Regions:
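Active-site-adjacent beta->alpha loops and helix N-cap segments on the catalytic face
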Residues: 3-4, 55-71, 85-91, 105-126, ...
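Structural preference for beta-strand elements that scaffold enzyme active sites
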Residues: 3-7, 47, 75-79, 99-102, ...
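Conserved anion-binding
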Residues: 13, 19-24, 91, 98-172
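N-terminal beta-alpha supersecondary unit
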Residues: 15-61
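Catalytic cores of alpha/beta
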Residues: 74-100, 181-220
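Short secondary-structure boundary segments
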Residues: 8, 52, 105-106, 129-131, ...
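Short, acidic/polar
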Residues: 29-41, 85-91, 144-155, 207
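Non-catalytic positions within long, well-ordered alpha-helices that form the structural scaffold/packing
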Residues: 41-44, 94-95, 157, 211
Length: 241
């Protein structure tokens, strides 16, 4: 069964959600991030998706204290993205408690550096590919690179890449359903790579459809905050996995 990965997006140490990656369309949610992470872990999730939105914009991690607090609160895997622009930042993220690191802008703009990270950290590195109109968006989705997700995968797959999170920016935060056909096409083209669906999840029915399509992982964010998907829903799904 498809693995559900709840998301916690961070700005100024708080839980937020953007719409289509627009920093001007921000909604702040109540609650302490570490407490929310603990609720997810209690529901039985194996991994939590953490995004440092301040870091993505600044090019440096900005919410590492929150990561430390979450890592102290839960024992599940933590994947972290945002602001990982150089090796010192990557090491700081791992030191703060992340089990996996997501590199998007570096993979697109400094591929030689991402290759070094793959060689050093192996499966702990995740390729983050944020797609808008078929092109890769970088630096907090504020710019675009003249590359496709296929270009990136073909480059890094021979070097040991195991996972890629692909976000369809046009669906992100919209609660309109995922771009299932995109992920099915990618999974078919690169069967040895584990693709994570990100963007648009609005209901458990979306998740069931992705599962039937043979996809392996899905990130759920706004649908949980807006109570379209409950922690009970997630717990029941995981119990049946």
């Amino acid at each position: 069964m498809i693995q559900i990965i709840p998301a916690i997006d961070l700005m100024d140490g708080r839980c937020v959600r953007l719409t289509k990656g627009d920093y001007g369309q921000k909604k702040v949610y109540d609650g302490v991030p570490a407490d929310l992470a603990r609720q997810y872990a209690d529901a039985g999730v194996q991994r939590i998706h953490l995004v440092d939105l301040d870091g993505a914009k600044a090019g440096e991690p900005r919410n590492l204290r929150v990561l430390e607090a979450i890592a102290s609160a839960v024992s599940c895997q933590l994947e972290w993205g945002g602001g990982i622009a150089h090796s010192e930042a990557l090491q700081a993220v791992f030191d703060a408690g992340a089990t996996h690191a997501i590199a998007g802008s570096v993979a697109a703009l400094k591929p030689e550096l991402f290759e070094q990270w793959l060689q050093r950290y192996g499966a702990r590195m995740i390729l983050g590919a944020d797609v808008r109109g078929g092109r890769i968006a970088v630096r907090g989705w504020l710019e675009e690179a003249p590359l496709s997700i296929e270009d990136l995968v073909r480059r890094f797959l021979p070097l040991g890449l195991k996972e890629s999170i692909v976000t369809d920016i046009s669906r992100d935060g919209m609660l309109e359903g995922p771009s299932t056909e995109l992920y099915v096409r990618l999974q078919s083209a690169f069967p040895t790579l584990s693709f994570t669906v990100s963007g648009g999840i609005s209901s458990m029915e979306d998740i069931r459809s992705l599962d039937k399509a043979g996809l392996q992982k899905v990130i759920v964010g706004k649908a949980i905050y807006e109570e379209r998907i409950t922690l009970k829903d997630i717990a029941l799904w995981l119990q049946n996995a």
